[in-house]
Amino acid sequence: MLHTLHRSPWLTDFAALLRLLSEGDELLLLQDGVTAAVDGNRYLESLRNAPIKVYALNEDLIARGLTGQILNDIIPIDYTDFVRLTVKHSSQMAW
C-alpha cells in the first residue's frame, strides 16, 4: 500500500499512521508532510524503524528549504517517480 502524508506530522494522527504501516508498504511525504523527514524531529526515528521505504517529494523539500536537512534514509523523488509509485500500488491511503 502507498501511504501519502501531505500534512505536517504535528497535525496528523501519526500514531495511527504508524500502526497501519505493514512490511512492503511505502510512504510518500509531500507538501507539509516533508517536515517529517527533517533530521532531529520526533517522528523521524519512528519512520526509520518502520518496515517500509520512505520517500519525499523533492519539489516540496526545495520549496520549504529542507533539502540539506533530511537523512539519507529518506529518498527524494520527483513527480515522475510519484506517478510510478501510484501505478505500483493498487491501494493507497492519504493522511
Swiss-Prot record:
Localization, UniProt: Cytoplasm
Gene Ontology CC: one annotated term: sulfurtransferase complex
Stored Pfam families: DsrH
Keyword presence, Transport: no
Keyword tRNA processing attributed: yes
Keywords for the protein's UniProt record, in alphabetical order: Cytoplasm, tRNA processing
Function: Part of a sulfur-relay system required for 2-thiolation of 5-methylaminomethyl-2-thiouridine (mnm(5)s(2)U) at tRNA wobble positions.
Protein name: Protein TusB
Organism name: Shigella flexneri
UniProt gene name: tusB
